[in-house]
């Protein structure tokens, strides 16, 4: 039940876009087409669902203070948390590279439409942010970290597909010239963020 609460909260309450404003570059640049946005969103879900649990295990058994005591008691005082950023980024980059090769092989049309934004998932701050938030929240099991990673990815997917659908609908609307493009996208993001704030009253026991 606790994992379910973490999963739902990471989608609607601690949404990467609306609560933390993470991953905004690709969110704004790619969200002009629902199909492309959905493809990128699924890729982000995949990367987060894999990297967050892996980085959780890395933190618990390698990086944190005393994590290496499982090897031998002499390593009980070793603290490798200064390597957190380097190793987290290495894991993320490796998973993204594998994902890029798979997408290019099996869905070349999606690969072409995503362009540079697919490999840039490796430096998407939402991906790194999820692993760092996971570390900060100090989850008690790999299942909880998986729920958080999967939920964070789905939350980002909902955000980018939602705004892409709205931007497609207003494409032929009369929008003031000064607000066209990024301007109206920011306004829409703010309105969607306000809508997601309605979930703040939900509590999990």
Q: Which sequence ranges carry the predicted segments?
A:
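Helix-coil boundary and interhelical linker segments in multi-pass alpha-helical membrane proteins
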Residues: 1-4, 60-82, 131-146, 205
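Structural signature of hydrophobic alpha-helical transmembrane segments
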Residues: 5-18, 78-92, 147-159
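Generic transmembrane alpha-helix signature in multi-pass membrane proteins
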Residues: 21-29, 100-106, 117-120, 125-139
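Hydrophobic core segments of alpha-helical transmembrane domains in multi-pass membrane transport
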Residues: 22, 26, 44-50, 89-98, ...
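C-terminal ends of transmembrane helices
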Residues: 22-36, 96-110, 163-174
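Cytoplasmic-side transmembrane-helix entry/capping segments in multi-pass membrane proteins
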Residues: 36-46, 84-88, 110-121, 178-184
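Ordered, amphipathic secondary-structure segments that act as subunit-interaction surfaces
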Residues: 60-114
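Interfacial loop-to-transmembrane junctions
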Residues: 168-186
